């Protein structure tokens, strides 16, 4: 792990004070930290420096002081709380929002330099019913999935009904979510207590979920053990692309910016906001590990290779497309190389060859790269999730079974940002992940994503529905393996809108 995260700047910590909203100027210049609240595993791309981001943003007209901080940062949070709430008194809530909550909201620019990071970063997003409660029901955001909410579309996402959903997500009762991130849970809890004290009886708590990076050398890895957050795209006007990294227009993630195909249907105040897809995804780690052990014969007895072929990366983060037979930690920890591949090789037959990366591998299903020609630039998300829950206990490991004790549940607090949910998260889940024939044109159908895919829609929405997967055996691409266990179980979620800071001040608080 890198010992430092971002350089400390004295004179260029933020964009000029004249560019800041009035509510922001009084506190942002006060250094509050000497160490970053973010993590920076070697395998993940670095964030730009404040100066680099300011220069890039100016070239395309982005205002990083007005964009909430979580949207463009990616999977770099250390400790994070998701505090879901309902609005009980809209008038009081709006008054508190303007006078006391708004100064706590953290912008993108603030997070890029340690000296300007707050003790705890705070972001805020609203569901459609939350916007309705604030009097904005008539001002739609031009996104039908956001408007209807996630609960009504659960089965279209592959969920076997909603019996496994956390009760708070069932329906449309959640109006908003605070996202609080810091380097200690005590900091997060203290900031949440302050917010609750400010808002008082204007809100009621619906649910909370505590996430945190896994310990020690597992920092940056999700609970199955794989390094995460390597392949987020580069954003024009914010970050510089590394080799193999897609460079995408900001409007794919920020409403009404260049590249947003629905700009004409957005209200003016929605500019520079983003649509947040949240999912609580339970990971059944003992069951996953048992499957690898029981089926290692598919990969000549190498359970780690089987897992790598299912994911598309070794646990280190090294891609199997570049390291098809053995892990390569040096490759994994080199952002100049670990994303620089496209699933093609000399003398490959692209419709049949799965010797390097299976067609069904998770990272190929969710980011097909040169399986598209020309490269796809429409269906992308920025992932900003974090693991939740404790490590696997000895009892779970020995029994190969996840505990039914709710306090031992573990998984991923999945967060995806996009400007159009139907082109982003929902499209990827429905049309790629859960589609046994995607990517099209392969001689042997790829099958369903073996990590997060679901075949429930083809089996009367039954849990643990059998799902076909090809390519796990590197010596026989025609072998179809049937998975009979869901390694990832949806516990529900919701769609939110993360508004700009100026929208919070000038529209949502009015």
From Swiss-Prot:
KW Membrane (keyword) present: no
Residues in the signal sequence: 1-19
Active-site residues from the entry: 228
InterPro entries with a match to the protein in the record: Dimeric_a/b-barrel (IPR011008), DyP_N (IPR049509), Dyp_perox_C (IPR048328), Dyp_peroxidase (IPR006314)
PROSITE patterns tied to this protein: DYP_PEROXIDASE
Cofactor: heme b
Pfam (any one): DyP_N
Manner of cofactor binding, per the entry note: Binds 1 heme b (iron(II)-protoporphyrin IX) group non-covalently per monomer.
Record keywords: Heme, Iron, Metal-binding, Oxidoreductase, Peroxidase, Signal
Gene Ontology BP, a term: carotene catabolic process
Enzyme Commission code(s) on record: 1.11.1.-
A GO cellular component annotation in the UniProt record: cytosol
GO molecular-function terms, A-Z: heme binding; metal ion binding; peroxidase activity
Propeptide regions on this chain: 20-58
Enzyme class: oxidoreductase
Chain residues that bind heme: 362
Complex and partners: Homodimer.
Entry function: Peroxidase capable of degrading beta-carotene.
PANTHER family: DEFERROCHELATASE, DEFERROCHELATASE/PEROXIDASE
Family: Belongs to the DyP-type peroxidase family.
Name assigned to this protein: Peroxidase 2
Originating organism: Mycetinis scorodonius (Garlic mushroom)
């Amino acid at each position: 792990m890198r010992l430092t995260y971002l350089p400390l700047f004295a004179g260029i910590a933020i964009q000029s004070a004249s560019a800041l909203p009035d509510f922001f100027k009084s506190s942002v210049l006060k250094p509050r930290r000497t160490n970053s609240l973010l993590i920076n595993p070697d395998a993940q791309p670095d964030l730009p420096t404040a100066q680099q981001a300011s220069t890039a943003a100016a070239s395309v007209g982005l205002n990083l002081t007005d964009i909430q901080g979580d949207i463009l940062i990616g999977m770099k949070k250390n400790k994070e709380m998701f505090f879901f709430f309902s609005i009980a008194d809209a008038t009081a809530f709006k008054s508190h929002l303007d006078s006391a909550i708004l100064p706590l909201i953290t912008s993108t620019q603030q997070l890029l330099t340690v000296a300007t990071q707050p003790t705890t970063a705070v972001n805020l997003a609203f569901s459609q019913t939350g916007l309705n409660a604030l009097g904005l029901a008539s001002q739609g955001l031009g996104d039908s999935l956001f408007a209807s909410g996630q609960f009504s579309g659960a089965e279209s996402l592959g969920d076997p009904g909603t019996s496994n959903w956390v009760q708070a997500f069932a329906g449309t009762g959640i109006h908003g979510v605070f996202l609080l991130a810091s380097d200690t849970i005590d900091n997060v809890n203290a900031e949440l207590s302050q917010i609750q004290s400010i808002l008082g009886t204007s809100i009621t708590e619906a649910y909370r979920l505590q996430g945190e990076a896994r310990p020690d050398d597992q920092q940056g890895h999700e609970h199955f053990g794989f390094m995460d957050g390597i392949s987020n795209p580069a954003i024009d006007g914010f970050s510089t692309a590394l080799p193999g990294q897609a460079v995408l227009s900001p409007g794919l993630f920020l409403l009404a910016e260049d590249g947003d195909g629905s700009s004409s249907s957005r209200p003016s105040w929605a500019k520079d906001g983003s649509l947040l897809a949240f999912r609580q995804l339970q990971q059944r780690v003992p069951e996953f590990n048992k499957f690898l052990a029981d089926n290692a014969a598919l990969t000549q007895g190498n359970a780690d290779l089987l897992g790598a072929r299912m994911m598309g990366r070794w646990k280190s983060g090294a891609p199997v497309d570049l390291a098809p037979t053995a892990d390569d930690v040096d490759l994994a920890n080199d952002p100049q190389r670990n994303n620089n591949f496209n699933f093609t090789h000399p003398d490959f037959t692209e419709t049949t060859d799965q010797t390097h990366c299976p067609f069904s591998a998770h990272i190929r299903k969710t980011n097909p790269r040169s399986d598209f020609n020309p490269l796809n630039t429409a269906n992308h998300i920025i992932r900003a999730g974090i693991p939740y829950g404790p490590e696997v206990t000895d009892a779970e490991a020995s029994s190969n079974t996840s505990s039914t004790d709710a306090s031992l549940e573990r998984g991923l607090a999945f967060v995806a940002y996009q400007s159009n949910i139907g082109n982003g998260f929902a499209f990827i889940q429905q049309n790629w992940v859960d589609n046994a024939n995607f990517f099209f044109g392969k001689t042997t159908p790829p099958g369903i994503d073996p990590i997060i895919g679901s075949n429930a829609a083809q089996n009367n929405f039954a849990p643990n529905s059998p799902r076909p997967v090809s390519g796990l055996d590197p010596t026989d691409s025609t072998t179809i393996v049937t998975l009979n266990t869901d390694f990832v179980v949806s516990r529900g979620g919701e769609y939110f809108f993360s508004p700009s800071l100026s929208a919070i001040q000038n529209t949502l608080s009015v």
